[in-house]
Design a protein with these regions (language model features):
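Conserved donor-binding loop and adjoining core beta-sheet/short helix segment
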Residues: 45-83
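Active-site rim helix/loop that mediates acceptor-substrate recognition in acyltransferases
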Residues: 28-48
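Terminal substrate-recognition subdomain of acyl/acetyltransferases
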Residues: 1-3, 11, 107-131
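Acyl-donor binding region in acyl/amide transferases
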Residues: 70-117
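Charged/polar, solvent-exposed surface patches and flexible loops
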Residues: 15-22, 26, 41-44, 87-90, ...
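Short amphipathic alpha-helix that is part of the acyltransferase structural core
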Residues: 1-34
């Protein structure tokens, strides 16, 4: 079994995005904090990056990151289910260090805590919808 994580360059983003988009649509629909249009706009900025994880040459996950000051945020991560997408973490963390980031940040549902045992919860976010 061969896992590979690919950083998508600006030059290949146009060709890669249609393949990645369904994974990210699924992720943003579950989360609700971002729309796919916002993610697409973010990817036009130099602070954002698109990542693809493959296993045996089959795409299993894709992620969007954003460097914001001294942190690298995983904005959206969509995958085939299960822990397969975890192969993304080490390359994303290495990239964050190369961008002078002191930390990685993931904001999401409580299930992320279980999926990311090396990460800690520095605070709790509470919200109330004002419909």
């Amino acid at each position: 079994m061969t896992d590979e994580v690919l950083f998508v360059s600006r030059e290949t983003m146009g060709a890669a995005w249609p393949l990645c988009r369904p994974f990210i649509v699924h992720a943003v629909n579950k989360c609700g904090d971002w729309t796919i249009e916002q993610v697409e706009h973010l990817l036009m900025l130099p602070t954002a990056a698109l990542w693809i994880a493959t296993r045996n040459d089959i795409m299993i996950a894709t992620a969007v990151t954003e460097v914001d000051g001294d942190q690298c945020k995983i904005v959206a991560l969509g995958g085939m289910g299960g822990p397969d997408w975890r192969c993304l973490l080490q390359p994303l963390e290495k990239y964050a260090k190369s961008m002078a980031c002191a930390r990685m940040r993931v904001e999401g549902r409580p299930g992320w805590q279980k999926a990311l045992p090396d990460y800690h919860q520095p605070y709790v976010v509470l919200e109330k919808r004002l419909d």
